[in-house]
């Protein structure tokens, strides 16, 4: 038996592998990630709560394909051009500030006055009756401001988290530090999801924060929803400003060594080349290693998109209005955050003790097990109901889907993100910086958009199709892509080991 002092040191190493001298850098980085992930959790719930109850879960696939993917491509072009003219610090302020400005405009100007900007329901219904195959595009046009909010919310994840924050972290930490820092960073950051969920539940509960005279008739009107939305958006903007201040503090007062200050102009100096947009994309295409990282992201995005659509459709059946949907997503965020923090504690030890390969394989394994459980439950829901007697099958389906979503994303945030980011570290600064920009933004959304293409094509050709009617085809795609993901992880591991030597 170990002496108490050694035992507690071992426990500390497992739960908190950060050394005291590293806290000066770790604490602001962790707080910065907490703010960014708070916004991610809140925005994810807001976009779904606006879109699904008013337009249907099926329309999400069209959003991701026809709106989010082109937006990501445009942003990648702009980012590469900015990276050749400005240093990373200024790019960070410009990008995050632009997001925060839009969120304020949406909450205080666009959303409360949407009746002025959106066409009336009679016109939309007449257009849908005349052009049934364009039903979903007409619906997008009818709620164009919701579409804009959806795009900006999706880009927050791809741009601010995956590109800006992790690129900054990858430059600061080497491989050995990343094994210790990244899981704990994620653990602290995911507390932001719990806080976001709590904020959403508080403001969507109604009676506690809304004048009772507004309830119940006005609470689901744009005016009532705006009363709930505006304070949440104000908190989101405040969190974004805090993240920018922390970024400023890290650059100006903590990273005193000029080598550690990330400056995309230095890429040009070191390599004596200035990449154009086309050259940057070619660099990614011609690098098999970067291609494999992109395939990881594509597989995850496609698979989670295939499972999420049917699940959100079921939530709409149970919670058909914005406020109830919002409240459910807030509670979902709380459980997601708790699960993520728990997985982060486990994941940090798996990564340090079992290595990159096992850690990278656990996410697809977790997703395959929980995803298959969800599909089987939906396909055989009546048979399952007959076996277990009289209970709310719709509620049970939503709970199974929620468990699938929580466990899959928890393993993704704790292990997938950390192993993916570690895969970039052995690369040259040039490939890491500009290659990551293309892979993270385009790769992240291409995976979801590929799943969205399959679904949206069906919904366009067959306007009456629903997720229930195409579920068996989604299951087949799920199994094929899961097999490809596992094979790609094994291949990438061999190349990662070679580069680390």
Swiss-Prot record:
Gene Ontology annotations for the cellular component aspect, listed alphabetically: plasma membrane
Annotated S-S bridges: none
One family name in Pfam for this protein: TLC
Keywords: ATP-binding, Cell membrane, Membrane, Nucleotide-binding, Transmembrane, Transmembrane helix, Transport
Record membrane topology: Multi-pass membrane protein
Molecular functions per Gene Ontology: ATP binding; ATP:ADP antiporter activity
InterPro entries found in the cross-reference section: ADP_ATP_car_bac_type
Domain of life: Bacteria
Membrane-crossing segments per the record: 23-43, 59-79, 90-110, 146-166, 183-203, 227-247, 293-313, 326-346, 361-381, 383-403, 446-466, 470-490
Transport recorded as keyword: yes
Location(s) in or outside the cell: Cell membrane
Annotated function: Provides the rickettsial cell with host ATP in exchange for rickettsial ADP. This is an obligate exchange system. This energy acquiring activity is an important component of rickettsial parasitism.
NCBIfam families assigned to the protein according to its UniProt record, in alphabetical order: AAA
Similarity remark: Belongs to the ADP/ATP translocase tlc family.
Protein name from the UniProt record: ADP,ATP carrier protein 3
Organism name: Rickettsia felis (strain ATCC VR-1525 / URRWXCal2)
